[in-house]
Amino acid sequence: MANFKVVVSDPKEARAYQIDIKDAEANALIGKSIGDVVDGSIFGLAGYKVQITGGCDGSGFVMKPDLPGPRRQRILTATGVGYVPKLPGQRRRKMMRGKEIAPDIVQVNAKVVEYGSKSIKALLGLETAEEAPAAE
């Protein structure tokens, strides 16, 4: 079964939250691509919409948004994700993953694009008693 560490970034709060998902929730992500918008309830964020922005596999190879399919490929690259040239015009052949999520992906990066009624901290159980609004 697939297990993923999902890093969900919240642009409003400028914070990131790491969530471990397993089995049925993880299987819902398999086959999705970078740029797809998924329901946040997969990650325990009911009411939220989340966009997949990237990830990497167990060997540390990054997912490239313009590389089709789920497999690893050695591609000739000049700039972009996973490579910064040392000299202008320098190119290099690098191993990268395609944009589709497969079972051997370890980390999935995502960002919130549509917010729900509750805060992310409250949904994940990270809100402490003094941070929570008093219910009177």
From Swiss-Prot:
Keywords: Ribonucleoprotein, Ribosomal protein. One of its GO terms (molecular function) is structural constituent of ribosome. InterPro entries: Ribosomal_eS6, Ribosomal_eS6_arc, Ribosomal_eS6_CS. PROSITE patterns: RIBOSOMAL_S6E. Transmembrane segments: none annotated. One of its GO terms (biological process) is translation. This is Small ribosomal subunit protein eS6. SMART domains: Ribosomal_S6e (SM01405). It comes from the Archaea. GO terms for cellular component: ribonucleoprotein complex; ribosome. Belongs to the eukaryotic ribosomal protein eS6 family.
